[in-house]
From Swiss-Prot:
Residue ranges of the TM segments: 254-274, 504-524, 564-584, 601-621
Record has Cell membrane as a keyword: yes
Topological type in the membrane: Multi-pass membrane protein
Protein name: Uncharacterized protein MG242
Keywords for the protein's UniProt record, in alphabetical order: Cell membrane, Membrane, Transmembrane, Transmembrane helix
GO CC annotation terms, alphabetical: plasma membrane
Intrachain S-S bonds: none
Compartments, record wording: Cell membrane
Amino acid sequence: MKFNKLNLSHCISFYISEVSEVFFESINQHPSRDFVNNILQKIKTTLSEEELEKLNSIEEVTKDEKIVIMLNHVLKKIVSKTGSSKCDLFNVIKQDRFNSPVYIQSINAFENNLINNEFAERRYDYLIEVNKNSYLKKFVNSIRISFFLDLRAQILSGSFTLNLVNKSIEKQKKTEIFKDIFVNALVKHFICNQLYPISLNSFIFDSENPSNKLALKERIKLLKTNWNSLFFDKFYNCLNNKNKQQLQETSDEMFYAVINTYLIMLISVEELRVYFTSKEPALILKVLDKKNTLREDPDQNPETDLYELIQFIEQNYLKKDKKTSWNKKKVQDLEQLLEEINKINLETKNESLAYPDEITELEIDNDNFVSTKQVFRNQLELQLLHGIVINPEKYGIGMWSSYFADWSEYKNLIEQMLNPKSGNDFYQFEKDIDESICQINKKYLTFISSDSNTFLIVKNDDVKVISNYVWAQLFFETRRWIINDIEFDLYEKGFDKSHFSRNIALLESLSFSWLDPFYGLTSIKEIMQKIDSKSNLKTSIEEMVNRFKHEQRINKKDNERVLMIFAYIAAFVVGFINFFSMVFTILTVSDLNAGLTVPNIIVISIASVLAFILIVIAVLFRFKWKHIKH
């Protein structure tokens, strides 16, 4: 069977909370298109100039072309800080009306029909193409930004899709695709074990503290040392190339390409956060939609680009009033360093990114995909590709593998598996296929890993299906990400009773049923059902809601117990006052012995016994209360 093309992408999700209500009040988001297109035009004629300007500003803030202006502005700043006069990091798509370069374009992956148009207005999809002459090309071909304004949860759910491999394999050996998969698995392993948590604070500390400036250089030096150690040990030393200088240059370029790409994504997220949490986004647009002249930095290398990006982040996104410092003496190894970073992340509100999920797309010469057995039978390369993508741990290249196989070990295993005499068990392979199958279509087959973080798409060359998986992952991963954040706060800070109602409301807004519109994309429902069967996300949300409600009920009972304590104390005080009032009323006479009559003594004795019982009840209640709390 002929392999035509390989695409390998990483999907990295994020979310932005506390989105300004302005974006959900926009007329463009109104569910009735008849209202927008007809009635609104009539209303406009009756409005004053001030009211009309306000209405227009509400309409403008969510328009696709305005979001392009906002994102392109930050890309222009990035370009001015990086690259060289002859080679920008990104391709220029066109020139705007001010004759300035535009580096980002809107892409319409789905048709806007009447049924899903309401949701289409809240879906945004953009593409940034990397300059083929840029060092970023060593790592990524293009960056796709997709996000959705979630009205129910009042959040922005988004993801970056990094296209890492996009090559024709018609004139190459099929085994070359396994090399591409290995290298990108190694990059993913590094990111998840060295860069996580993926946030601004993973790279940057307080610039006003001189010791932290030194710490930043040490941090980058440590990352680069670990990168070189990993790549030379696992890959470069296993190659026949003996030119160490050339390998070192390749390794350095790849390192800076990876780090700078992630910084660019974090900058983009911060720009989205600033815009979508603003109470006056129209003012931001007015400032941006003007001719801006940005100073071009002189020609520089990838390392200088890294420090320029960090300086840009320090000046624009890190809080000036927040002293985020770290204990330099305490940090002795990477684990302690990550612990310090986690502490700083808790103190700031900068956004972070999730683990990279993987989508591998293979185009083959095949006209009928109805039968998985027919497609895979006697196709050892295809069977092996399925195994490596869906179960990478078995081949020693898993994201969390405690031991990551080197290239020689991996290559020998590949050659062994591709040997027809090795006696591969097709029956066991069929079981793996049945467990991982996601969709069966005449034009394609798709598969999902057991942790629902990896997809394999096998298709012919005339069908586009990857967008369905990008949006399905976006829907699920942002929800998983929010739940993880809630759980992290829960276990790190304990049950904060003041947040019960807010957490319950947020979780209920994230819950879903299979009758939901799913961003207006009915084509992703089947994919999400399969993801949920692996991850149990739907059930997890419901269980967490029930847990918070249970804790809320316990908290309510605790409050009732506290009120009961106050009631007992009040009764105790009132009882004692009445008791002594009665005693002094009886005894306060001119003749003391006159008050000591039998009836009075009986009354005083009974009152004393009752007072004693009240004291005993209060003491026992106090001890029991302490026992319950502990």
